[in-house]
Regions:
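Long, amphipathic alpha-helical surface segments
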Residues: 1-31, 36-47, 54-71, 81, ...
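Short alpha-helical scaffolding segments that buttress acidic/His motifs in well-ordered protein cores
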Residues: 14, 86-94, 123-125
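Short, residue-level hotspots on alpha-helical faces of the histone-fold
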Residues: 65, 92-93, 97
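Amphipathic alpha-helical interaction surfaces
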Residues: 73-76, 96, 100
């Protein structure tokens, strides 16, 4: 039977990296966010910094509503039957980065060519760059230039998340 829904392992992976915030805040992309990364309520209304605090139970309801979009994206983009853990890992990846990131990634190409290819782990780990232009005196993007304009930083949180997703994918 084809897997089309994330299970509790997948939910736990996402919540462990997203973290819970009861009050609205601006995420690194400068978007008002609440709960476990929710930017729109199930009604479709955007989160506002003026909104009231929510409980963990409400946040989980919002997260599950949000995840349904990413489950559909992973299901439609992957042309092979995935295991539950493979599906969970790809939904977590897509929830964090967006459906377009998965759609255009070498990760998806590898998954669709051979879902058990061990080099897929390396493709998860390509997606560990982000940041706001903070300088760290390193060549984070490997092009031989240190702290040039537009250089993205390797973020420890993204390294941990992509590693956890890759590990789940292969269990």
């Amino acid at each position: 039977m084809k897997i089309t829904k994330i299970d509790n392992k997948g939910i736990e992976l996402i919540t462990s990296f997203e973290g819970f915030r009861s009050k609205p805040y601006l995420c690194p992309a400068n978007v008002p966010t609440i709960g476990y990364g929710t930017t729109r309520y199930p009604t479709g209304i955007k989160v506002s910094l003026k909104d009231t605090a929510i409980t963990k139970e409400q946040a989980l309801i919002f997260l599950k509503n949000d995840i349904s979009f990413y489950e559909k994206a992973v299901d439609s983009l992957c042309n092979d039957n995935l295991t539950q853990n493979q599906f969970n890992a790809l939904v977590s990846f897509t929830y964090n980065l967006g459906a377009n990131a998965l759609k255009t990634s070498s990760l998806l190409k590898k998954v669709n060519t051979n879902r058990n290819d061990p080099t897929i782990k390396n493709n998860f780990l390509l997606w560990v760059f982000g940041g706001d232009g903070t300088r760290n005196s390193k060549d984070d993007d490997g092009d031989g230039l240190i702290d040039e304009i537009g250089e993205k930083l390797k973020l420890e949180g993204l390294i941990r998340r992509r590693t956890a997703e890759a590990n789940l994918y292969f269990t």
